[in-house]
Amino acid sequence: MNTINKYSKTITQDETQPAAQAMLYGIGLTEADMYKAQVGIVSTGYEGNTCNMHLNDLAKDVKFGVASENLVGLIFNTIGVSDGISNGTDGMRFSLVSRDIIADSIETVVSAQWYDAVLAVVGCDKNMPGSVMAMGRLNRPAIMIYGGSIHSGKWKGESLNIVSAFEALGKKFNNTITPEDFKGVIKNACPGAGACGGMYTANTMASAIEALGMSLPYSSSNPALSQEKKQECLDAGKAIRVLLEKDIKPKDIMTKKAFENAMTMVVVLGGSTNAVLHLIAMAHSVDIELTLQDFQKTSNNIPVLADLKPSGKYLMEDLHAVGGVPAVMKYLLENKLLHGDCLTVTGKTVAENLANIPSLHQGQTVFLPLKTPLKATGHLQILYGNLAPEGSVAKISGNEGDFFEGKAKVYNDEYTVIDGVKNGEVASGDVVVIRYCGPKGGPGMPEMLKPTSAIMGAGLGKNVALITDGRFSGGTHGFVVGHITPEAYDGGTIALVKDGDTITINTKNNTIQLKVSEEELTKRKSEWKQPKLKATKGVLYKYAQCVSSASKGCVTDN
């Protein structure tokens, strides 16, 4: 039989470790506990945002379930950054950085404490990939437990979510919302605990990780405050014991085929562009090369079927009500769009997990059949051209068309764009260029939700495109292209764009072009000087020194 405490016994059963054992007795462990496997339960819980405010309570449920399986569960915490709070401020530069800090800190604690397994209770956007990256590096039995989605808010009969609050600002600029309604939307958009409710980054990553096999069935769609979520947490102990006994580790689960399942889920649900960065980084943690071309191949073959916000009508709670992510996976498997033989954290394969799962409800309109897709091919399009010779990522829902040509309106940060929208600088037909916001130039590759929301709220969404070497929130919609590489800080072509230049974006042939002669670009490049890093010490400075490009997942351990 497999020894399930093969790591912790180094501390608990070695007579040359008396001080370590004294400390463990000091926290309340018994003689019998010294022979049990130890499970590190990491929570990204903190009081500062709705996505994470309930996670420490869920971690206690997880600990109870672990103890019920004759295992020792020990809770520890790591950081979280709220994208919703930091968006549009300098704080957003710490968001992507937090993903790698989360991964590093979980790896550090589990390795130093000699835990035999890991259960991660996570909420906001970067929590999920950060925890799974750590699991991949550690390669010990592990399960991710998603904190679940928030319920929708309500104001004057209208359903609200976090993007309603962001877009209210653009409506205010455009004088299409009253002061009372502006305040009403803000006060009611987030009615309690849970991650942002649309198919934004948190729900995208939770769904992708469930399809990957690293979370239990329904984890991604069980609402935050539901009895189902509590039961999932209680059941995690039984599941982690199975993984310990069978010695099933992340590298057994996170295979190339499993990542193909995850990419399929991202596309079919119309998920966030951030999934490109995060899945590449997660694959890197288990020594699998995932590329931009893998995402394009998926988009070429998989349609968008879920009518979910930000581009569609519904929220994750609506998808859960008609069957949830497992029912979606069952539909995809029945139509030969998923690999059913991939192993998962249940100890069973995808196909085995789905065998007795109820199908999507008859007559529901949240997830459409293959014969009537929202978009016949994927919304994530990888674009190349003289503006992005190493690639970029466009999010094209189908509402924007597939071609845009316009005059560049250049900004060297995201803040001045807001003033540009407010003051009428940004006009119909413009291509807004936001640069020096890449992994190094930011530093931290901030999201552009505030500028895109201002553009949408001002009624310019169908007539203005936006391109950047930064990122987009999962809540962004419109004609947008991000992750442009090389970034401006590294002297990429985006650094050479001038106001009035013509930019062409063609998602049919996957190109993004600056219509400027090679001679002129060579002249501009010779005159360009690399700016000083915006950070001169601390975590952002360290990040800028070691981060890879967006096309490589912005990893910091390569």
Curated annotation (Swiss-Prot):
It catalyses: (2R)-2,3-dihydroxy-3-methylbutanoate = 3-methyl-2-oxobutanoate + H2O; (2R,3R)-2,3-dihydroxy-3-methylpentanoate = (S)-3-methyl-2-oxopentanoate + H2O. Mg(2+) binds at D83, D125, K126, E447. Pfam families: ILV_EDD_C (PF24877), ILVD_EDD_N (PF00920). InterPro entries: DHAD_IlvD/Edd, Dihydro-acid_dehy_C, DihydroxyA_deHydtase, DiOHA_6PGluconate_deHydtase_CS, ILV_EDD_C, ILV_EDD_N, IlvD/EDD_N. Its EC number is 4.2.1.9. It is an enzyme of class 4 (lyase). The active site is at S473. Binds 1 [2Fe-2S] cluster per subunit. This cluster acts as a Lewis acid cofactor. Pathway: Amino-acid biosynthesis; L-isoleucine biosynthesis; L-isoleucine from 2-oxobutanoate: step 3/4; Amino-acid biosynthesis; L-valine biosynthesis; L-valine from pyruvate: step 3/4. GO terms for biological process: isoleucine biosynthetic process; L-valine biosynthetic process. GO terms for molecular function: 2 iron, 2 sulfur cluster binding; dihydroxy-acid dehydratase activity; magnesium ion binding. Keywords: 2Fe-2S, Amino-acid biosynthesis, Branched-chain amino acid biosynthesis, Iron, Iron-sulfur, Lyase, Magnesium, Metal-binding. [2Fe-2S] cluster binds at C51, C124, C196. The modification N6-carboxylysine is found at K126. Its cofactor is [2Fe-2S] cluster; Mg(2+). Transmembrane segments: none annotated. Functions in the biosynthesis of branched-chain amino acids. Catalyzes the dehydration of (2R,3R)-2,3-dihydroxy-3-methylpentanoate (2,3-dihydroxy-3-methylvalerate) into 2-oxo-3-methylpentanoate (2-oxo-3-methylvalerate) and of (2R)-2,3-dihydroxy-3-methylbutanoate (2,3-dihydroxyisovalerate) into 2-oxo-3-methylbutanoate (2-oxoisovalerate), the penultimate precursor to L-isoleucine and L-valine, respectively. Belongs to the IlvD/Edd family. Homodimer. This is Dihydroxy-acid dehydratase. The lineage of its organism: Bacteria, Pseudomonadati, Bacteroidota, Flavobacteriia, Flavobacteriales.
